[in-house]
């Protein structure tokens, strides 16, 4: 089979397409014939050497959609999924076949194409684990999403809307963000003061922070009494400081979420919760760009340089080897 491989850490130019043996599933595992696989920013970080647990040589990739070939009673089923440590200590989904824990697989949402289903993965699983599982957002509550324009932020906004919560978006962009009731430009506006102004001085019930770094403390100060902040990343400086007295006087709560640490069972449960949202159209994917597998390194380069205009999804069913086919969020 063909697989995208890297034997050293570095830029996307270290990636090579190689012929390797089709893997065999072990106990509790399934072999999936990959039809499409998304590229996430974390895949770029993995190839560059950002993750200390990655062993070489390795096939990257976390998200995929395909057909079960071996290892489960429902062989032939169309599935989608993402697996813990996939592409880190076990070969990932950027290959024609991938072996994953069978428990992580979920039936593909019927309205979605393989390429669209492959694009759900990390953004929506991370968003659900943060907004629903960790923050436990409730109907009528207000949540501040820092980095609302990003892939995980957009997923979180839709999930919060689905849960009947009010969303305030924040980030470095200007202009409206779908699903938000207000947007704060953190380059030109004071985050805390803006939030207090939008909430009549009360603060928000929860913060989902996809950025961290310099946004951490003002986001923490934006919470109401008893509010909670969920953090999944730290852009720039990994260390932050905050007023501990204010923190405990406000009865604030701080939670971290790492999607790499989710168990196969947790991933499967989240996938099952997400499926009705996509099947009913409540959740909608952002546009994707389908790229033939042979041009995987080029797609990686676009993501690394932040030049991709849509989610990059590798396809193994490309008819002519050209690039440029796009799908909107819910086209079949």
Which sequence ranges carry the predicted segments?
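N-terminal Rossmann-like NAD(P) cofactor-binding module of classical short-chain dehydrogenase/reductase
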Residues: 80, 207-208
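Short amphipathic alpha-helix with an adjacent loop that forms part of the alpha/beta core around
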Residues: 191-201
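Conserved "cap/hinge" positions at secondary-structure junctions
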Residues: 70-72, 83, 102, 147, ...
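NAD(P)H dinucleotide-binding glycine-rich loop of Rossmann-like/cofactor-binding domains
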Residues: 81-147
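Glycine-rich beta-strand-centered segment in the early N-terminal region that forms part
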Residues: 21-38, 48-86
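Mid-domain Rossmann-like dinucleotide-binding core that forms the NAD(H)/NADP(H) cofactor-binding site
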Residues: 118-189
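Glycine-rich phosphate-binding loop and adjacent beta-alpha segment
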Residues: 163, 171, 214-282, 316-332
């Amino acid at each position: 089979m063909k697989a995208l491989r890297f034997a050293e850490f570095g830029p996307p130019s270290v990636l090579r397409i190689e012929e390797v043996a089709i893997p065999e599933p072990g106990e509790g595992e399934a072999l999936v014939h990959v039809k499409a696989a998304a590229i996430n920013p974390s895949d770029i970080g993995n190839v560059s050497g950002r993750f200390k647990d990655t062993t070489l040589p390795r096939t990257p990739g976390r998200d995929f959609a395909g057909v079960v070939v071996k290892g489960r009673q429902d062989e032939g089923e169309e599935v989608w999924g993402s697996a813990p440590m996939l592409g880190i200590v076990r070969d990932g989904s950027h290959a024609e076949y991938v072996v994953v824990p069978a428990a992580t697989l979920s039936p593909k949402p019927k309205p979605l194409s393989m390429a669209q289903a492959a694009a759900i993965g990390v953004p929506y699983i991370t968003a659900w684990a943060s907004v629903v599982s960790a923050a436990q957002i409730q109907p009528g509550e207000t949540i501040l999403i820092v980095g609302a324009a990003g892939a995980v932020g957009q997923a979180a906004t839709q999930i919060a809307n689905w849960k009947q919560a009010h969303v305030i978006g924040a980030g470095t962009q200007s202009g409206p963000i779908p699903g938000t009731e207000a947007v704060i430009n953190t380059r030109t506006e004071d985050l805390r003061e803006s939030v207090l102004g939008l909430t009549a001085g009360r603060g928000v019930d929860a913060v989902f922070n996809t950025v961290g770094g310099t946004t951490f403390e003002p986001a923490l100060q934006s919470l109401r009494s008893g509010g909670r902040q969920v953090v999944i990343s730290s852009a720039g400086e990994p260390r932050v400081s905050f007023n501990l007295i204010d923190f405990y006087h406000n009865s604030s709560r701080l939670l971290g979420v790492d999607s790499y640490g989710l168990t196969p069972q947790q991933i499967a449960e989240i996938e099952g919760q997400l499926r009705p949202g996509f099947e009913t159209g409540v959740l909608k994917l952002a546009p994707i760009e389908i790229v033939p597998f042979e041009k995987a390194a080029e797609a990686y380069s676009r993501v690394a340089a932040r030049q991709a205009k849509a989610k990059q999804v590798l396809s193994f069913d490309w008819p002519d080897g050209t690039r440029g086919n796009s799908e909107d969020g819910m086209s079949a």
